[in-house]
């Protein structure tokens, strides 16, 4: 199935969806595909991590989750970019009728604690989530086997020239890529489970940039086209596995403060790396940042 074009705005080589969280969910619910939500530190990884670049390039839809990126874009480029946070996207998914259908949602989670919290949330909120709808991800290691198609280009990165309409023309979907593996991740057990259950929506709740790589891997390994949501910690903000972030804090770009206070040792290094973001926006604007460090082949 070919996804029709939709309005986008380009920042750092990524075409971001223009619209509401509900509209993004409706689009992916109808056509399936890989959706990514780069945080501020993830933009830095575009220069440092070629695996991550390929995973982001493989996305069918990208949302501007980073409040810092949206703010700096407005200050430095004098342009408005609509923000859709991963939290808002996840809540919009939960508000759909699809979320109430047994077996439709499948969660990939970072820990047994996250699984327990997800199941408790489902029971308390009336969602038919069972233990079989949850998968605790292993600690993924980078593969030493490199994909020879290092210039693979997918949906979220810009085409060579910007379209006059401001809408992104999507490439035809092709899951018949037996030799393709997503950058740095393989999990045949997970693929087998998903193939058996065939959920319509796959929520990848692991973080650290691994969610996008796993999402790209699943997109090309599965024989059908579900919606794959690479939204990191966002489900945990709702289920209680992570610190609760009020919607007002998310709306005013200060949700990161709540997270930092809850996990300073883990998050401070990642947030500190985001100090490079304003310089990247000033230097590259709409263009894809150059890769600073090439991965080993």
Residue ranges and their predicted role:
Residues 1, 99-100, 123, 128-129, ...:
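Intrinsic disorder/low-complexity segments
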Residues 97-125, 272-287:
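An alpha-beta-alpha
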Residues 1-91:
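N-terminal nucleotide/polyanion-binding subdomain common to many enzyme families
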Residues 136-140, 224-262:
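Short, flexible loop segments at boundaries between secondary-structure elements
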Residues 68-71, 244-294:
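A transmembrane-helix-recognition feature enriched in membrane-embedded lipid enzymes
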Residues 194, 198-208:
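Proline-aspartate-enriched helix->loop->beta-strand connector
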Residues 40-43, 68, 206-211, 234-235:
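Short glycine-rich anion-binding loops that position phosphate/pyrophosphate groups of nucleotides
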Residues 32, 101-102, 223-227:
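A short helix->loop->beta-strand "cap" motif at the edges of active sites that frequently abuts
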């Amino acid at each position: 199935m070919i996804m029709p074009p939709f309005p986008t705005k380009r920042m750092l080589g990524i075409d971001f969806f223009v619209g509401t969280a509900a509209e993004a969910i409706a689009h992916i619910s109808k056509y399936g595909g890989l959706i990514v939500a780069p945080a501020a530190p993830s933009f830095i990884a575009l220069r440092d991590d070629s695996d991550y670049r390929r995973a982001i390039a493989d996305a069918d839809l990208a949302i501007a989750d980073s409040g810092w990126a949206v703010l700096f874009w407005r200050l430095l480029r004098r342009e408005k970019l609509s923000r859709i946070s991963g939290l808002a996207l996840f809540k919009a998914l939960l508000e759909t009728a699809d979320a109430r259908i047994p077996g439709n949602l499948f969660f990939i989670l970072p820990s047994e604690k996250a699984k327990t919290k997800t199941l408790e949330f489902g029971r308390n909120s009336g969602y038919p989530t069972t233990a079989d709808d949850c998968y605790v991800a292993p600690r993924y290691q980078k593969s030493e086997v490199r994909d020879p198609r290092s210039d693979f280009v997918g949906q979220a990165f810009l085409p060579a020239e910007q379209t006059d309409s401001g809408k992104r023309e999507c490439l035809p979907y092709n899951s018949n890529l037996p030799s393709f593996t997503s950058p740095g991740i393989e999990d045949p057990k997970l693929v087998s489970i998903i193939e058996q259950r065939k959920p319509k929506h796959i929520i990848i709740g692991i973080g650290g940039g691994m969610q996008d790589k796993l999402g790209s891997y699943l997109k090309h390994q599965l024989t059908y086209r579900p919606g794959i949501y690479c939204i990191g910690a966002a489900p945990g903000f709702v289920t209680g596995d992570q610190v609760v972030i009020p919607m007002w804090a998310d709306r005013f770009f200060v949700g990161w403060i709540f997270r930092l206070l809850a996990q300073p040792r883990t998050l401070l290094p990642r947030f500190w790396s985001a100090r490079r973001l304003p310089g990247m926006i000033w230097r590259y604007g709409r263009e894809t940042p150059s890769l600073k460090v090439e991965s080993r082949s």
